[in-house]
Amino acid sequence: MANNFTTPLATSHGNNCDLYAHHSTARVLMPLHYSLVFIIGLVGNLLALVVIVQNRKKINSTTLYSMNLVISDILFTTALPTRIAYYALGFDWRIGDALCRVTALVFYINTYAGVNFMTCLSIDRFFAVVHPLRYNKIKRIEYAKGVCLSVWILVFAQTLPLLLTPMSKEEGDKTTCMEYPNFEGTASLPWILLGACLLGYVLPITVILLCYSQICCKLFRTAKQNPLTEKSGVNKKALNTIILIIVVFILCFTPYHVAIIQHMIKMLCSPGALECGARHSFQISLHFTVCLMNFNCCMDPFIYFFACKGYKRKVMKMLKRQVSVSISSAVRSAPEENSREMTESQMMIHSKASNGR
């Protein structure tokens, strides 16, 4: 089984470099991880979308960016069942290259649409807190709609070429899908991926850190000028939310992009084939860091829950209503059940009495 996966690059050098030697472990852990992501991500984001839609009359720029982020996460979860099956089968894609390409498209759309909308949210909050007078123009819903449309167009323009690129590859008796070794022969691959990391990670995280650092400075200045603000705990809650957003972003997106950047630099510094051990380590790191990055779609609803008072109140109200309906249904069904049992008992007694006569 270990020899089922050998890449052409390794074979040409006479080495049996199995980049999927970890498949026996991965076929258990990765489906489990993505099943949790699918359930939590789908339920959490659908709940967030329901709350946003119910409050559409009060929608503003922040809510609109959040809604687009939620839609991006829901779109991603729809592609997860096929990936779960792929990993459970030990990196074997059995439903054709066309669906593999569509899955890759959805994956990258979610990744970079999510990053872009998180960046939009940080800029939106920056103007709301640091430059409130300018924010009056930016918070206009028409302006925010234009920004959201631009983000989707940009992301689709960046990712649509994936539909024209073969994503699957025969490896022994299996077919891999959306794996890095499938693209190793692409011309100028290191430069392409380094450019993608620059635009899709380095630039957004720089903007996010700058915006939130300025917001923190403004909150500290406000607290010094007005002690009542500090006592109310509003600033502390805002700072905790900012820290949560930054920590989630760094934990989810940094490992993947750092792994890509360092490996591409190695390839540029050593144009020849890298050692099998280095390539296998990179392949394992990709699987681990991609799992971590995809977990971000589960974290977004929790950020809304703790950050947005209105969202938290709405969710709790919906849950209480659901529990209340369940309890009342159970209470109503209990007398009906007892009544039915009594009727059946009476009928049996009557039947026996009739037979006795």
Swiss-Prot record:
Glycosylation site residues: N4
Residue spans, topological domain Cytoplasmic: 54-73, 124-145, 212-237, 309-357
BP GO terms, sorted: adaptive immune response; cell chemotaxis; dendritic cell chemotaxis; dendritic cell homeostasis; G protein-coupled receptor signaling pathway; humoral immune response; leukocyte chemotaxis; mature B cell differentiation involved in immune response
Tissue expr: Expressed in mature B-cells and increases in expression early after activation, before being down-regulated in germinal center B-cells. Expressed in astrocytes. Specifically expressed in CD4(+) dendritic cells but not in CD8(+) dendritic cells. Expressed in monocyte/osteoclasts precursors and mature osteoclasts.
Keywords of the record: Adaptive immunity, Cell membrane, Disulfide bond, G-protein coupled receptor, Glycoprotein, Immunity, Membrane, Phosphoprotein, Receptor, Transducer, Transmembrane, Transmembrane helix
Ranges facing Extracellular side: 1-27, 92-101, 165-188, 262-283
GO molecular function list: G protein-coupled receptor activity; oxysterol binding
UniProt record similarity statement: Belongs to the G-protein coupled receptor 1 family.
Protein name according to UniProt: G-protein coupled receptor 183
Gene: Gpr183
